């Protein structure tokens, strides 16, 4: 048996004769700058493509007044070779969209675009007209009261829409407001695809809610009595069919307590609602939640945990009982056998040791819990599987594995290392809001 046939039978994929795998520059950029900040430059990563694939560069600039959105995709492609091409999809006056595309196979790293100069053509100031329009480019949403600009001469209508960009490592929603020379929802001027990036346009205002966004995990001794801040400065735009949500879960074991909260867009199909639920009541461990789904911009605006605490019945000072139990809440770890012990209140005659797994709303964590309960078979969530945006699962007397955020591990395309020194990394901050989660 030949060596080639043997390798094929063992599952090895052999390149076709004459077809060589290329190395390509690789990465994505999605950002909004001031027009005066252009041109920009970047440092791409490298990637090895499958045999037969080429390298591609796709760059687009969307300009509205003093702002410009830059979208860049670099990587491998199945598309046929194409010479560098600059396309003016829509030029002013007012909003404009221009792109650069290139596909090559002649050598490694032939997609070597490292700056926005091919699309950089400073324009002289336009003569002002009589129309004023809100001007905004944002991946987080344009808020009411956005600054209005005097539109250039030749524009007659204000544009307000949402561009959805999908493909080539790009997955984003761009809210666009600005000046246009005609009415209607036609910023793209018929364009449906630029390079590997598919584009759709929507001007139905009800289809793109803007919601507050952020997660928080806080552990303290008196969170069940004293309200704490629950605000975030970040926002996000929702997909069609989503509404805004805010979910807050309180766990109080006596000596310590934990709040877990999230704000953002809901799952598709959620209905408007607001409620407070006591899942486990004293004597012993208290577990309660506040959930709110709503369908107007920034309606998930509760500013403190008082929205939950004010709905809880007042608790008298507990009368000590005869049982002692370890007490602990570890939202990002495991309670140990050496947890502090406390005398349980009268009526709480058993010790609880288990964990609750929460996932959803940008958060995934297993919380280890120890405390006093009234019944030996008590489940703190009373078999509840959904708390607002959170999917919940409870187990007793099991050591949970290590916690991690949703989406942990390798993501899709790597982002670029900026030559201008801009870098952002999501993080979960202990005891404070994590807006980027």
Curated annotation (Swiss-Prot):
This is CD177 antigen. Glycans are attached at residue 189. Residues 133-210, 325-377 form the UPAR/Ly6 domain. In association with beta-2 integrin heterodimer ITGAM/CD11b and ITGB2/CD18, mediates activation of TNF-alpha primed neutrophils including degranulation and superoxide production. In addition, by preventing beta-2 integrin internalization and attenuating chemokine signaling favors adhesion over migration. Heterophilic interaction with PECAM1 on endothelial cells plays a role in neutrophil transendothelial migration in vitro. However, appears to be dispensable for neutrophil recruitment caused by bacterial infection in vivo. It comes from Homo sapiens (Human). Induction: By CSF3/G-CSF in resting granulocytes. Induced during CSF3/G-CSF-mediated neutrophil differentiation. Induced during pregnancy. Induced in patients with polycythemia vera (PV) and with essential thrombocythemia (ET). The keyword rRNA processing does not apply. GO terms for biological process: cell adhesion; cell-cell adhesion via plasma-membrane adhesion molecules; cell-cell junction maintenance; innate immune response; leukocyte cell-cell adhesion; neutrophil extravasation; neutrophil migration; positive regulation of neutrophil degranulation.
């Amino acid at each position: 048996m030949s060596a080639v046939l043997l390798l094929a039978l063992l599952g090895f994929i052999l390149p076709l004769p004459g077809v060589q795998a290329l190395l390509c520059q690789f990465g994505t950029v999605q950002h909004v700058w001031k027009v005066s900040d252009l041109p920009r430059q970047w440092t791409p990563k490298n990637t090895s493509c499958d045999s037969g694939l080429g390298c591609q560069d796709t760059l687009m600039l969307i300009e509205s007044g003093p702002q410009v959105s830059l979208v860049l995709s670099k990587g491998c492609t199945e598309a046929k070779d194409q010479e560098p091409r600059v396309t003016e999809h829509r030029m002013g006056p007012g909003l404009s969209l221009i792109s650069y595309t290139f596909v090559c196979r002649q050598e490694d790293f032939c997609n070597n675009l490292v700056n926005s100069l091919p699309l950089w053509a400073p324009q002289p100031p336009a003569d002002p007209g009589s129309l004023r329009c809100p001007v905004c480019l944002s991946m987080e949403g344009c808020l009411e009261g956005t600054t209005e600009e005097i539109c250039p001469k030749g524009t007659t209508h204000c544009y307000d829409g949402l561009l959805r960009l999908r493909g080539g490592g790009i997955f984003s929603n761009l809210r666009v407001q600005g000046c246009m020379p005609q009415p209607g929802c036609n910023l793209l001027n018929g364009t449906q695809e630029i390079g590997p990036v598919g584009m759709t346009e929507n001007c139905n205002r009800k289809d793109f809610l803007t919601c507050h966004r952020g997660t928080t995990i806080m552990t303290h001794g008196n969170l069940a009595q004293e309200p704490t801040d629950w605000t975030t400065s970040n926002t996000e735009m929702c997909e069609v069919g989503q509404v805004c949500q805010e979910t807050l879960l309180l766990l109080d074991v006596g000596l310590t307590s934990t709040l877990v909260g999230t704000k953002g867009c809901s799952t598709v199909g959620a209905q408007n609602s607001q409620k407070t639920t006591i899942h486990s009541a004293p004597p012993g461990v208290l577990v309660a939640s506040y959930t709110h789904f709503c369908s107007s911009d920034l309606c998930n605006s509760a500013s403190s945990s008082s929205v939950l605490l004010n709905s809880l019945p007042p608790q008298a000072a507990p009368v000590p009982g005869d049982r002692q139990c370890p007490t602990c809440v570890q939202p990002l770890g495991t309670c140990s056998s050496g947890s502090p012990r406390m005398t349980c209140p009268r009526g709480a005659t058993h010790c609880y040791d288990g964990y609750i797994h929460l996932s959803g709303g940008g958060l995934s964590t297993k919380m280890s819990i120890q405390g006093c309960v009234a019944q030996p078979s008590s489940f703190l969530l009373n078999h509840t599987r959904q708390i607002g945006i959170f999917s919940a699962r409870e187990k007793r007397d099991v050591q949970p594995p290590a916690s991690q955020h949703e989406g942990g591990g390798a993501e899709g395309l790597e982002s670029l290392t900026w030559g201008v020194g801009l870098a952002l990394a999501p993080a979960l901050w202990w005891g404070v809001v994590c807006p980027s989660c």
